Amino acid sequence: GFGTILKALAKIAGKVVKKLATKPGATYMLKENLK
């Protein structure tokens, strides 16, 4: 169902965020993407 898709996307997003968090400027990039 749709909920399963959202959970899968959340897991992927979490992994991406963790990878970006180790790089300088990641916070700035995330803020820009959320605008």
Swiss-Prot record:
Question: According to its UniProt record, where is this protein located?
Answer: Secreted
**Its domain of life?**
Eukaryota
Segments crossing the lipid bilayer? none
One GO molecular function term of this record is: toxin activity
Tissue specificity note: Expressed by the venom gland.
Query: What does UniProt give as the signal peptide span?
Result: none
Keywords from the named record: Amidation, Secreted, Toxin
Tagged with keyword Secreted: yes
- A GO CC term? extracellular region
Residues found modified as Lysine amide: K35
Taken from the UniProt record, the cysteine pairs bridged by disulfide bonds within this chain are: none
Main subcellular location of this protein, as a coarse class: secreted
Say which family it is in: Belongs to the cationic peptide 04 (cupiennin) family. 02 subfamily.
Q: Which protein is depicted? A: Cupiennin-2a
Its source organism is Cupiennius salei (American wandering spider)
